[in-house]
Regions:
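Acidic, metal/ion-coordinating pockets
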Residues: 1-194
């Protein structure tokens, strides 16, 4: 599982759109599921859309991409911008979902993704609108519990943790959605002692 920001930080990012090298490498490494982070928007909506389409067209094993709090309803009501439409089409082509179920041995795990508020603040080129991460997570967990027979519910989150518990988005998520068994927390690079 991966918590996002898979696309930046090395020279390989120069082929982000044309080769989808980072996403394809996650597949080579055996990563089953990822979500996106703020850096996936560094090449704007068209860059993210091109990367997803390139990864899909490669025919290679790539991880599932999950994010449950994109607010397509609000964007469609206002009329999708060109960038929003590009990402929506790429999502459909790639098969992006709110959650997926993976089987590891005898264990079935539902994995959903969420994009945090601070992540959005760090992605000024992101054209998408998002539902509140906590509320979207609650809805998704309820949907999983209703429709899936799983042993565990995991969240790949690009929200993060910080020392101030009142601002630590993934700690707040854990407290407000107690049916999540595991949160893979990306974004903040914070070391936690417990």
């Amino acid at each position: 599982l991966d918590g996002g920001d898979f696309s930046m930080g090395t020279l390989i990012q120069t082929v982000y759109e044309t080769e989808a090298a980072e996403l394809r490498m996650l597949g080579y490494l055996g990563c089953d599921v990822t979500t996106w982070g703020n850096h996936e928007f560094d090449y704007r909506s068209s860059g993210l859309a091109n990367m997803l389409n390139t990864a899909k067209a490669s025919g290679e094993n790539v991880p599932s991409l999950v994010v449950c709090n994109v607010d397509w309803s609000a964007m469609e009501k206002a009329g999708l911008t060109e960038g929003q439409q590009q990402i929506k089409d790429a999502f459909e082509n790639y098969g992006v979902k709110d959650y997926v179920v993976v089987q590891k041995g005898d264990v079935k795990i539902a994995v959903f993704g969420v994009f945090g508020k601070d992540s959005l603040d760090c992605a000024p080129t992101c054209e998408l609108l998002f539902e509140d991460p906590i509320e979207a997570s609650k809805k998704t967990v309820e949907e999983i519990k209703k429709n899936e027979d799983v042993d565990m519910i995991a969240c790949v989150s690009h929200s993060g943790t910080v020392e101030d518990e009142d601002k630590s988005e993934d700690e707040i998520l854990a407290k407000n959605v107690p049916d999540i068994d595991l949160i893979i927390s990306g974004h903040t690079h914070t070391q936690l002692d417990e």
